From Swiss-Prot:
It catalyses: Hydrolysis of proteins to small peptides in the presence of ATP and magnesium. alpha-casein is the usual test substrate. In the absence of ATP, only oligopeptides shorter than five residues are hydrolyzed (such as succinyl-Leu-Tyr-|-NHMec, and Leu-Tyr-Leu-|-Tyr-Trp, in which cleavage of the -Tyr-|-Leu- and -Tyr-|-Trp bonds also occurs). Belongs to the peptidase S14 family. SUPFAM superfamilies: ClpP/crotonase. One of its GO terms (cellular component) is endopeptidase Clp complex. Transmembrane segments: none annotated. The keyword Hydrolase applies. It is an enzyme of class 3 (hydrolase). Its main location: cytoplasm. It comes from Haemophilus influenzae (strain ATCC 51907 / DSM 11121 / KW20 / Rd). The active site is at residues 98, 123. Fourteen ClpP subunits assemble into 2 heptameric rings which stack back to back to give a disk-like structure with a central cavity, resembling the structure of eukaryotic proteasomes. Keywords: Cytoplasm, Hydrolase, Protease, Serine protease. It is found in: Cytoplasm. This is ATP-dependent Clp protease proteolytic subunit. The gene is clpP.
Amino acid sequence: MSVIPMVVEQTSRGERSYDIYSRLLKERVIFLSGEVEDRMANLIVAQLLFLESEDPTKDINIYINSPGGSVTAGMAIYDTMQFIKPDIRTLCIGQACSMGAFLLAGGTAGKRAALPNARVMIHQPLGGFRGQASDIQIHAQEILKIKHTLNDRLAFHTGQGIERIEKDTDRDNFMSAEEAQAYGLVDEVLVKR
């Protein structure tokens, strides 16, 4: 059972209590924490759209601590990040692996960061399918298309050549915050506010 801290604020009408995530959302901070899956993606997309409707000129901050997860769920978040008007500041706290790293890199150029002890990992998409040979072939072709799309987007966001991205994502590729900065996944390593 997880406990979510509450924040109590004084207002002109008395006290108002919020869970900590709702309070931070008021400050345009979204937490992307845990496995990237459909339910989480729907919540993140809804928060992004809400914050855009509140003020399309103010940056939105996404704090990422994720081992990765579903490609389709992650692409729903990514496409929304690219679609909406506000700039997206991404910050890796803890880890940004697989789809988490992809979303970290997908923040607005110049506004992507990692904390000093954060870890980032990129790799090719994982797939597994059982069934008839013809269905396995269809799924294999689909995962190759997804791999090409992810590599193309990573090349765009990092400035690396597509050949380098293909080589570097062939296996799990772990990086420190400084290595992620040198690679182009983030723009800076934050040490102090």
